[in-house]
Amino acid sequence: NFLLDTNKYVNKALKYSGLSDDLANKIITCNSTYTVRFGVRLRGQIYTFEGWRSVHSEHMEPTKGGIRFDMDTHAEEVEALAALMSYKCAIINVPYGGSKGGLKIDPSQWESRELEKITRRFAQELIKRDLISPSMNVPAPDIGTSSKEMAWIADEYRKIHPADINGSACVTGKPPSKNGLVGREEATGRGVQYIVREFFRNPDLLKLVKLDNDLSTKSFILQGLGNVGYHLS
């Protein structure tokens, strides 16, 4: 269980933090998880979809975290991923809380125009609950989503909130032609590249793991070839 595993490792780390048990429990606890179910008329019938948006911590706002489209996603997975977003941001002092979203869907089973209708309906459900908002909750691409879906979501937000001058900031990962940033697509994989580079430049860390700094003699295992793995490789 992904959520139990996440909490187990965090609990293990918190033992060394000196925090009180009640504060440690509050840090681990997810603030809220919203389940939304909505219908979309497609192919002559109404299909019902289920999705989630979890907010782990609002100690900093907006909260930040991707939206994935995946048949295997579920509420507990989304909660675990939201928690990891909180921890990642806190560890490196990025001023965001943690959030995550998921829609139980196989994107490959739908044509682009159908996927757009589904994405926009999901966005509407989240927007009206302030679960997509430039100042409160900002999604990004994840498994099964890309800059295309982010552009649809941003457009839907601007339709619902036309007076919000920061409307385009309701999601990150948009195409550069839709107010997105050049280089964002490869940014995460590039970040891993820099981490590995700096690791091998640090003699103290290399000594701890009994490695030398000659990268030409090293091999590695890459788990997955999604956005991060592709650009890293």
Residue ranges of predicted features:
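Short, Gly/Pro- and small/polar-rich lid/capping loops
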Residues: N1-T35
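Glycine/serine-rich phosphate-binding loop and adjoining beta1-alpha1 elements at the start
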Residues: D70, C89-S216
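Glycine-rich Rossmann-fold phosphate-binding loop(s) that bind the pyrophosphate
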Residues: G224-L225
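Glycine-rich, N-terminal phosphate-binding loop and its surrounding beta-alpha-beta segment
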Residues: N25, T35-P107
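N-terminal Rossmann-fold NAD(P) dinucleotide-binding loop
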Residues: G229-Y230
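Residues that form generic nucleotide/phosphate-binding pockets
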Residues: Y9-Y16, K26, L81, E125, ...
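Conserved hydrophobic helix-helix packing surfaces used for dimerization/oligomerization
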Residues: K218-F220
